[in-house]
Regions:
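Short, flexible, basic/aromatic active-site loop/helix in glycosyltransferases
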Residues: 116-167, 218-222
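Structured catalytic core of nucleotide-sugar glycosyltransferases
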Residues: 1-130, 164, 168, 191, ...
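Conserved protein kinase catalytic domain
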Residues: 11, 56, 81-84, 110, ...
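Conserved catalytic core of Hanks-type protein kinase domains
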Residues: 86, 112, 145, 185-186
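Short-chain dehydrogenase/reductase
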Residues: 73, 78, 129-132, 136, ...
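Juxtamembrane loop-helix boundary motifs flanking transmembrane segments in multi-pass membrane proteins
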Residues: 20, 130, 134, 209-212
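Hydrophobic helical membrane-anchoring modules
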Residues: 1-4, 148, 172-247
Length: 247
């Protein structure tokens, strides 16, 4: 999939990011100027700080931006899933709304789908506190031990998917952390590339390290159960034996 030849949908969940959402969207739209067919689906997850109004105002002057809102707040998985289902593109790129993902990496993610169904970004040089890096390292190690997958950085939201593999996945709270694994159970081919990681443009994280780790471990048990019950098989149409006489 060479560069931006595909119709690309960017899906971005937002929760209380009034301090940075407009500059984040402005930077994203500039990065997408070389993509002839693109859209940005912004899903406000019941924000209470005026983010929704800022998004609606930005969308009014930028035709490529579509604004959706969840009411009440339903969580990051619900916001991602809503945007995924609304996306019109052949390729869906997921990213955060706090400015930590660099939209300049999107073109490389999309290009990598030429030989794969999913391209996961991993933060080669993390701009995080030591406690966050340690918590992430622990979660990734535990995940690899339990699920046996090879995803380097599950906490990096910047990922590109072929829409045909992503849209059929069933929604459940917490699923956004396991989308590559869930798609791989349907035969998806995954590649990974390094991406930039920056500090927040403004505002503060909505998660605590311990809370995120505990939820991930809990959800991982459910994914492991799904994985253990998955069987891969093919279906063929039986043909009559041409060597036998038919009365």
């Amino acid at each position: 999939m060479k560069s931006f030849e595909a119709h690309v949908s960017i899906v971005m969940p937002v929760y209380n990011e009034a301090a940075c959402i407009v500059p984040v969207l402005s930077e994203l739209c500039r990065a997408l100027e070389s993509a002839p067919r693109h859209e940005v689906v912004v899903v406000d997850d019941g924000s209470t700080d005026g983010s929704c109004e800022l998004i609606a105002g930005f969308a009014a002057s930028h035709p490529c931006v579509r604004a959706l809102r969840l009411d009440p707040n339903a969580g990051q998985s619900a916001a991602f899933w809503t945007g995924i289902q609304a996306a019109a593109g052949d390729v869906i790129v997921l990213m955060d709304a706090d400015g930590q993902n660099d939209p300049a990496d999107i073109e490389r993610l999309v290009a990598a789908l030429d030989g794969a169904d999913i391209c996961c970004g991993y933060r080669a040089r993390r701009n995080d506190t030591l406690s966050k890096r340690l918590a992430s390292r622990l979660a990734n190690a535990y995940r690899r031990a339990v699920l046996g997958d090879e995803i380097i950085d599950t906490g990096c939201s910047l990922k590109a998917f072929k829409a045909a593999l992503l849209k059929p996945l069933q929604y459940w709270d917490g699923m956004h952390r396991f989308l590559p694994m869930l798609a791989s159970l349907r035969g998806a081919r995954i590649v990974q590339i390094p991406v930039s990681h920056r500090g927040r443009m403004a505002g503060k994280s909505k998660y605590t390290n311990f809370g995120r780790l505990m939820r991930t471990i809990r959800d991982m048990r459910g994914v492991a159960w799904i994985q253990s019950r998955t069987r891969h098989f093919g279906v063929v149409t039986p043909q009559p034996n041409s060597n036998r006489d038919v009365d």
